[in-house]
C-alpha cells in the first residue's frame, strides 16, 4: 500500500503534466484566465465601478481598465471582514493572506478557493514533483520522504472569523491532518497556540535529530534553515543530552502542559544521541547534515537573488545537496515555479493570474506587454489580475526574463520598486525605515540632519545599521537608547521584521554617528561630479560601493 509520501510524489508528477500543458500554450491560457475573472467579478461593487463588464478581450481590458494599488481595495477588504458580500469578488473568501509592504499593519488580501488551490498544488505537489523528476533524471530513486520544515504555522482570525496567514504558510497549513506522515515536528510545535511561548529552533531540531532516516529539510524562506543550524552549533550538547535521556531541557521555552505531555512520550535514545554527539565533536568545518542524516537528499525554501548570501551559509551545513527554490509567490498569487533544483529562476504560471509587464526601460509605454510579448534579457515591472478581486494590481516587483520553458517565459526576481532593504527576506521599505527613524527621533526628542541605512552581513545574525548625522553635538550616551527605540519601531512598522527578530534571524540594529556636515559634503561631491542638485534624492539606503566608501569614511569616531 502506498504511503502518503508516495502519493505526494504521484501528485507531483501529475502537477507537472499540467504545468507542461499550460506552459505550452501561455497566450490561450491567459485569455481563458482573464475571461473567467471578468465573468466572475464583473457584477461586484468594484467591478461595476471600473466597468469590468464591458471587457470583451485582452485589448479591451488593457485599454479601459485602470491600474490599481492596495489603497483601491483597503476599504473593501475592511467591509468584507465585517460581513459584506460581493464587493471585489462574487464568492465569499475562503481565507485571507497577509502581505508585507505597508507601515503599521500588513496588507490583507482575500483569497478565493481557486487561488488557494493553485497555491496548494504548486507549493506542495509542484515542489515534490520537481524534486522527484530531478533525481529520476540522474538515476536516483526518490525514497519515502520524511523531513523537517523549519517554520511555525500560526495565523490569526479576522473579524469575519476567517483565518489570515502569510502566503507561504498556506500549502503546509492545509496538510495539518496528515503532516505527521512526512514531517518530523509534531503538530503541537508546528501549529502552536502561542508561537512566542515555544522555542521553535529547539523543537524542530529535537524531533528531526531523532530520525536517522530524514531525507529533506525545508522552510518557507531559506534563512529559517540557516538560523536553525546556527542554534544547533551553539546547543548541540544540550540537544544530545535530551535525546539520550528522553527529556526537554528546563531552559527551553515551552508551555508547561506541552512539556509534561511530551516528556511522557519521549523515550531515551542513547545510541542515536551518541552517534550525533560523535559527529558534532568532530566540528562543523565539513557539512554536518550528511554525517548525521545519511539518507538526506535535498532542501527547499524561497531563495531569491537577494538571499544568495544565505545559500552559502546553508551549504556549510548541507554540502552540495540540491536546493529547490520553491517558487515566486506572494499574497497576490502563486506566480512562478522553478523547473529544476538549484535554479534561481522560475517559469511563469499562465493558469495562475493574468500577467502584464511594464518595461523598466520604457515605463510610459502605450500599454504593458502580455506574456507572449516579453523578451529575454529585459526587465519588467509586474502587474497582476487574479481571481480574488485584484485588477491590474501593481505589486511593484521587477523581474528579468531569463529564457523559456516550453513556450512560457522564465523570470528571475530582481527587486521591488519601493524596496529599501531585504537582508532577511522581510521586505523593509523606505517608507518603513523613514517612519521608524522619525518615530525614534520624536519619542527621544532628538533630531538628525540626515540618516542612511545599510545592511550588515558581518554581524551574526545579520542586522541593519543606521548612520545618522545629529543636529548639534553628538551625545554618545544616547546610542543604546536610540538603538532600542529604532528596533521597537522597525518591529512595529513591519510584521515580518518583528517575527524575524523574535526568531533570531535578524539582530538588533546598530547606530553610528556621522561627522558634522557629512550630508553637505556628500551633496558637494555629487555636484562636483556634474549632478543636478535638485535631482539628488535623500540617501535613505547605502546600496552601492561609492556610497558605502563615502559614508563609512565619515563615521564620527
Predicted regions and their residues:
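Active-site diphosphate/adenylate-binding microenvironment
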Residues: 32-96, 108, 118, 126-140, ...
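Long, hydrophobic, well-ordered secondary-structure blocks that form the structural core
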Residues: 110, 115-122, 323, 331
Amino acid at each position: 500500500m502506498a504511503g502518503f509520501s508516495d502519493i505526494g510524489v504521484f501528485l507531483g508528477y501529475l502537477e507537472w503534466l499540467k504545468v507542461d500543458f499550460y506552459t505550452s500554450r501561455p497566450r490561450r491560457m491567459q485569455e481563458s484566465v482573464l475571461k473567467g475573472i471578468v465573468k466572475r467579478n464583473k457584477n461586484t461593487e468594484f467591478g461595476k465601478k471600473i466597468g469590468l463588464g464591458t471587457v470583451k478581450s485582452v485589448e479591451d481590458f488593457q485599454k479601459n481598465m485602470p491600474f490599481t494599488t492596495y489603497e483601491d481595495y483597503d476599504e473593501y477588504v475592511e467591509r468584507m471582514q465585517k460581513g459584506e458580500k460581493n464587493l471585489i469578488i462574487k464568492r465569499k473568501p475562503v481565507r485571507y493572506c497577509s502581505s508585507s509592504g505597508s507601515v503599521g499593519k500588513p496588507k490583507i488580501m482575500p483569497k478565493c478557493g481557486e487561488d488557494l488551490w493553485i497555491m496548494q498544488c504548486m507549493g506542495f505537489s509542484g515542489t515534490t514533483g520537481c524534486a522527484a523528476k530531478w533525481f529520476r533524471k540522474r538515476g536516483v530513486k526518490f525514497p519515502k520522504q520524511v523531513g523537517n520544515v523549519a517554520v511555525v504555522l500560526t495565523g490569526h482570525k479576522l473579524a469575519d472569523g476567517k483565518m489570515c496567514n502569510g502566503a507561504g504558510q498556506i500549502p503546509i497549513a492545509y496538510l495539518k491532518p496528515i503532516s505527521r506522515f512526512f514531517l518530523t515536528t509534531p503538530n503541537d510545535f508546528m501549529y502552536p497556540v502561542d508561537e512566542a511561548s515555544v522555542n521553535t529552533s529547539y523543537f524542530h531540531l529535537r524531533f528531526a535529530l531523532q530520525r536517522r532516516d530524514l531525507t529533506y529539510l525545508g522552510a518557507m524562506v531559506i534563512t529559517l534553515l540557516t538560523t536553525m543550524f546556527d542554534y544547533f552549533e551553539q546547543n548541540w550538547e544540550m540537544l544530545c543530552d535530551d535525546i539520550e535521556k528522553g527529556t526537554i531541557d528546563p531552559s527551553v521555552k515551552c508551555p508547561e502542559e506541552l512539556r509534561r505531555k511530551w516528556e511522557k512520550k519521549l523515550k531515551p535514545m542513547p545510541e542515536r544521541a551518541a552517534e550525533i554527539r560523535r559527529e558534532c565533536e568532530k566540528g562543523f568545518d565539513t557539512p554536518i547534515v550528511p554525517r548525521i542524516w545519511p539518507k538526506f537528499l535535498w532542501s527547499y525554501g524561497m531563495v531569491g537573488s537577494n538571499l544568495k548570501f544565505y545559500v552559502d551559509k546553508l551549504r556549510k551545513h548541507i554540502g552540495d545537496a540540491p536546493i529547490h527554490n520553491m517558487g515566486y509567490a506572494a499574497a497576490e498569487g502563486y506566480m512562478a515555479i522553478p523547473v529544476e533544483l538549484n535554479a534561481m529562476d522560475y517559469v511563469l504560471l499562465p493558469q495562475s493570474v493574468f500577467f502584464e509587464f511594464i518595461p523598466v526601460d520604457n515605463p510610459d509605454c502605450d500599454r504593458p506587454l502580455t506574456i507572449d510579448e516579453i523578451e529575454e534579457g529585459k526587465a519588467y515591472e509586474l502587474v497582476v489580475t487574479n481571481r480574488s478581486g485584484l485588477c491590474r494590481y501593481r505589486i511593484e516587483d521587477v523581474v528579468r526574463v531569463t529564457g523559456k520553458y516550453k513556450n512560457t517565459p522564465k523570470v528571475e526576481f530582481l527587486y521591488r520598486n519601493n524596496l529599501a532593504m531585504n537582508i532577511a527576506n522581510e521586505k523593509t521599505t523606505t517608507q518603513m525605515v523613514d517612519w521608524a527613524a522619525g518615530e525614534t527621533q520624536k519619542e527621544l526628542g532628538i533630531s538628525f540632519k540626515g540618516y542612511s541605512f545599510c545592511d550588515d552581513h558581518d554581524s551574526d545574525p545579520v542586522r541593519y545599521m543606521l548612520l545618522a548625522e545629529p543636529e548639534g553635538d553628538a551625545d554618545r550616551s544616547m546610542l543604546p537608547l536610540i538603538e532600542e527605540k529604532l528596533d521597537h519601531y522597525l518591529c512595529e512598522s513591519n510584521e515580518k521584521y518583528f517575527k524575524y527578530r523574535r526568531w533570531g534571524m535578524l539582530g538588533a540594529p546598530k547606530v553610528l554617528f556621522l561627522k558634522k556636515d557629512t550630508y553637505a559634503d556628500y551633496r558637494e561631491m555629487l555636484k562636483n561630479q556634474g549632478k543636478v542638485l535638485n535631482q539628488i534624492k535623500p540617501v535613505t539606503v547605502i546600496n552601492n560601493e561609492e556610497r558605502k566608501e563615502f559614508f563609512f569614511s565619515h563615521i564620527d569616531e
